[in-house]
Structures are given as C-alpha cells and as structure tokens.
Amino acid sequence: GCEWDSWC
C-alpha cells in the first residue's frame, strides 16, 4: 500500500 510502497 501507499504506507510502505509507491504502487497505489
């Protein structure tokens, strides 16, 4: 998710 990665 946006909390640990940048795929959101």
From Swiss-Prot:
The keyword Secreted applies. Disulfide bonds join 2-8. The keyword Hydrolase does not apply. Keywords: Amidation, Disulfide bond, Ion channel impairing toxin, Secreted, Toxin. One of its GO terms (cellular component) is extracellular region. It is found in: Secreted. Expressed by the venom duct. The modification Cysteine amide is found at residue 8. Coiled coil: none annotated. GO terms for molecular function: ion channel regulator activity; toxin activity. Its target is unknown, but this toxin may modulate voltage-activated calcium channels (Cav) or calcium-dependent potassium channels (KCa). Belongs to the O2 superfamily. Contryphan family. The cysteine framework is C-C. This is Contryphan Li981.
